[in-house]
Amino acid sequence: MDSDYSDKKGVSVLMDLFEMKGIRKLVMSPGSRNAPLLFSFSRNPAFEKYVIADERSAGFFALGLALASGEAVGLVCTSGTAMLNYAPAVAEAFYRGIPLVAVTADRPAEWIDQDEGQTIRQEGAMAGFVKSYCSLRAEFDTSASAWYANRRLNEVLNHALMPRRGPVHINMSFCEPLYGTSSGYSGKERAITFVRERQELPEEVWDMLVKRFLEAPRVMIVAGFYPPDEDVSAALQDICKFPHTVLFAESLSNIRTDTGICTADRVLAAAGEDESLYPELLISFGGSLISRMLKTFLRRAKPAEHWGIDERFPAPDTFCALTHHICTGASGFWKEFAGRLKDKAPESLSPEGISYAGSWQKIKRKADLLHRTFMADAGWSDLKAFEVILRHIPHDAALHAANSTPVRYLQLFEHAHYAGGEWSNRGTNGIEGATSTAMGFSEVYSGTTLLITGDLSFMYDSNALWMPYVNGRIRVIVMRNGGGGIFRFIPGPDSLKELETCFETPLEVPVREMAGAYGWRYMKAVSAEELETVLPSFFASGDRAVLLEVETPRFENAPVLKSYFTYISGESYPVNR
């Protein structure tokens, strides 16, 4: 090792293993106790380093880097509450299978709870949402302690990288002095390579699955959030040629087929309570669903069989009907399944089965017509703004949507398939971190990264605006709608006298001033006509990040959306749209 590196042997071991296991991107936050990690990683040319002061923003920035690159990303912070600020991003990564490696510096164990500054109980603090954890001293006194550190670091890092991938936590305690350097350590560490047996389902299992699929009178495939995968889309396109099979693919599934339904809420609103639409066989994959209507429909349907394709163990029983947990990757499963169904034909289909997909397509056409009719003269609102925005997003974009309202509006519109995919932090569904995640994504993605966020979510993550990694490819649309507007739409809070003070929490967001303070270009639209005019220049290439404020009427957004669903469901014709 170069003499410019830390003399703490644990730092050298960690750097070597990071490099050997392909963890080359690191997001670091300033501090004193993590100084050996900071200056050592900074001086090592093998790593791409990002320094972000706010640990919560840093965690989500790393999440965005990992999403865009498909690689594991390291995090480095100092001791104390700095580590706790990683928790939201680490929890999000846990529920989405994203490999983040959180390395937290700590004080010596003997000083915990002894009124030492920046000293808290860090060990196991994130145990509930990491795949693996270890706590080590940065100094090794014996060959046995060096072996132990090497082994534990290998084990934890392998957990992050093995299927299903996910976050891990390495807590490393440092004694003073912290700034010493040494050339006495070789740095040639042992890497334990993880080799997993190729997962292949037995032939008898494939035969059973094919047989059950062909025998089932009504099959529904449901896709939750999933990274873009053209092979999966192609396989599902072939499978959905069977007349007894329908695909519901959420916008975040990044699945695009000719016949798949990607607007679940409006189609289900038009479907009503027709029990003949209930599936006999349900096959699901991907992450959690946005659509509460779809979850409710499937729980009510109680399908006779539900296959969950999921690498997690145990698999979630979201619809209270799970009968088969197929513990394998969705991409390989669908490609193999489509190949085995080639030249097959459904067996003994009932009249309902023969027309199952056709029945859903008929309802979809009805819902589409009602949607177009409603939107043709819909008043200015969030709903209208999303219709306009989605017409202008360039094909090369990566679309990020914040929680909770923006990601739901996306599902009401059929829109283009964007080259960079569609994303949202739906592992935990929190409003924090949306801007930081999009910023991290834009560091890797060469096209336009667009974030659509609400004003409350925007303010919640405003520290992202002053990161030093703002580039000319990032575009942010802030829906200025007066706070947590979703609470005016969902049943319950809208009837309480505490709606504004405890739920919606309206606020005046100084969007223009914030853009100016941090060097962003600023635009604004307060009508559909203004939005149509400003969007081409908003998306035009340039060397500055651009922030567009879209102001909509706070008290009209929820009535318009409620009126929309009333109209789609055919209950009545809206008086005021």
From Swiss-Prot:
Catalysis performed (reactions): isochorismate + 2-oxoglutarate + H(+) = 5-enolpyruvoyl-6-hydroxy-2-succinyl-cyclohex-3-ene-1-carboxylate + CO2
User: What GO terms describe the biological role, i.e. biological process, of this protein?
Assistant: menaquinone biosynthetic process
Keyword Methyltransferase in annotation = no
| Annotated keywords | Magnesium, Manganese, Menaquinone biosynthesis, Metal-binding, Thiamine pyrophosphate, Transferase
The reply to whether Metal-binding figures as a keyword in the UniProt entry is yes
Highest rank taxon of the organism = Bacteria
Enzyme nomenclature, EC number = 2.2.1.9
Q: What class of enzyme is it?
A: transferase
Q: Where is the signal peptide?
A: none
Q: How is the cofactor bound?
A: Binds 1 thiamine pyrophosphate per subunit.
> Which Pfam families does the protein's record reference?
TPP_enzyme_N
Q: Which GO terms describe its molecular function?
A: 2-succinyl-5-enolpyruvyl-6-hydroxy-3-cyclohexene-1-carboxylic-acid synthase activity; magnesium ion binding; manganese ion binding; thiamine pyrophosphate binding
Pathway linked to the protein: Quinol/quinone metabolism; 1,4-dihydroxy-2-naphthoate biosynthesis; 1,4-dihydroxy-2-naphthoate from chorismate: step 2/7; Quinol/quinone metabolism; menaquinone biosynthesis
The cofactor named in the record is: Mg(2+); Mn(2+); thiamine diphosphate
Q: What does this protein do?
A: Catalyzes the thiamine diphosphate-dependent decarboxylation of 2-oxoglutarate and the subsequent addition of the resulting succinic semialdehyde-thiamine pyrophosphate anion to isochorismate to yield 2-succinyl-5-enolpyruvyl-6-hydroxy-3-cyclohexene-1-carboxylate (SEPHCHC).
Family note: Belongs to the TPP enzyme family. MenD subfamily.
What interactions and quaternary structure are annotated? Homodimer.
Kindly provide the name given to this protein in its UniProt entry: 2-succinyl-5-enolpyruvyl-6-hydroxy-3-cyclohexene-1-carboxylate synthase
Q: Which gene encodes it?
A: menD
